[in-house]
Amino acid sequence: MTSDLETQLQQLQTEAVAAITSADTLDALETLRVSYLGKKGQLSQILKGMGKLDASERPKIGGLANQVKEALQQGLEQKKSDLNQAAIAAQLAAETLDVTMPGTYIPQGHIHPLNSTIDKALDIFVGLGYTIAQGPEMETDYYNFEALNTPPDHPARDMQDTFYLPDGNLLRTHTSAVQIHYMEDHEPPIRIAAPGRCYRRDTEDATHAAVFHQIEILAVDKGLTFTDLKGTIKVFIEQMFGDVPIRFRASYFPFTEPSAEVDVQWKGRWLEVLGCGMVDPNVLKNVGYDPEVYTGFAAGFGVERFAMVLHQIDDIRRLYTSDLRFLRQF
């Protein structure tokens, strides 16, 4: 009986080792483990015969059975490790990046002419000591008109059509509204540049758009004069357009007094580029500033107009068409 069990154990080990060696997946290896070493596995079935052995024979068979079990466990662990390593190696081989292969070509983008114009203008004003200020595009009537010396019955309201919202608010018609917000929150002296989108009910054509961009500057301090305003604008124009002739023409804006428009001589003709003036005392009073102590000046211009002049664009609508043939020129 002893020799029979020894033979069965040796045959089991030989068969199991061969099967483990041939296993090519972790699932197949687990199936072999259950088949040979599980509670109902082949080794357990053989060991059931130990009950028929004499007490003196059992230690020998038990020791042999443990040797077989340990050999199979070691074989299973080694094979499992080998399969894991092979899987990792295969994955690495499949995911290896050949750095000598050409990459996917991604064409370089271009800065939109509106963005480049805004960036250039703001860089100039920041260099002059101005702070960038932002404000909401949806405004109240107070900030867009009344605080800027334009009450409901003021005739200047007829100068521009406005997009009114159902709740009584409106889409701002100029970035001048930003100066009111800023002055309410800051004590003078102040110097700000306020860029942003504006909205007016204009009929779109080659020079007008319902949505456009504007930059407004504001300076408030003791002793500021129109000479300071002219000097600031001259420096700005020179850095934007170069050494070109400029002229100031008397004009009217409800929130500045006196007011002026500025023209530059460009390509042999005069072009209007911005409006400016000294801040009206009523505007200063509306934000709690004493106009007897402080004076200020403001200027504003349309970014689209500047971009069209700088890049010789003949139609404002080209700036919004997303035509790559046009945009790739910049």
Swiss-Prot record:
GO terms for biological process: phenylalanyl-tRNA aminoacylation. Binds 2 magnesium ions per tetramer. Its cofactor is Mg(2+). GO terms for molecular function: ATP binding; magnesium ion binding; phenylalanine-tRNA ligase activity; tRNA binding. CDD domains: PheRS_alpha_core. Tetramer of two alpha and two beta subunits. This is Phenylalanine--tRNA ligase alpha subunit. The lineage of its organism: Bacteria, Bacillati, Cyanobacteriota, Cyanophyceae, Acaryochloridales. The gene is pheS.
